């Protein structure tokens, strides 16, 4: 039985990796026309919350009515979708009992990643619209600012997605915080590992500038989130102990009360 479960785990892990590399390969050659399945709903959300109007230009993307902003294939967020899917799948395979890992977690993780990608994309583009008139901040030019904003938003949403997926965990808050390194490792794997394997480092300074930002920003985001959650745990009594310890303490209090009343 153990061998069977191990074989299924290996097969599921292989299926997840096949999905990841298939999506990555598809995105590397896809045009804006082929990415309408994610560009169209993203643009609809942006129009809803910004009041801006966009129209689709074949092979280019969605362009604003004033021709100042383009939602192109690079704005599709497919890399984030891949990262979110891989993170959710890895969490299920690594942190949950093998008996609970049915094959349905793969399409469920993919759908959840798609929904969160739409939300993260919409947020990032709305902020980019607000920053549109800013040419530079301190030593950052518009391209660097756009990159910084994208990395910050995407990793923030990736970590929040992980925390939401852990909401039913029976472990304490501090155990969950320790596992928060999973989204960091997955993010590094897709945003740094795959480009390195593809030889992107040959681009020289541009790649290493990108790699430095990708390495540092998620660490700062994760430290900030962990700090906020730790502070919240200190202020909120029910989060001071792991869940199992809380149950033990509760049972002990109940037994003590019974003894006192008798």
Where are these regions (language model features)?
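Hydrophobic N-terminal alpha-helices or hydrophobic patches in metabolic proteins across all domains
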Residues: 1-262
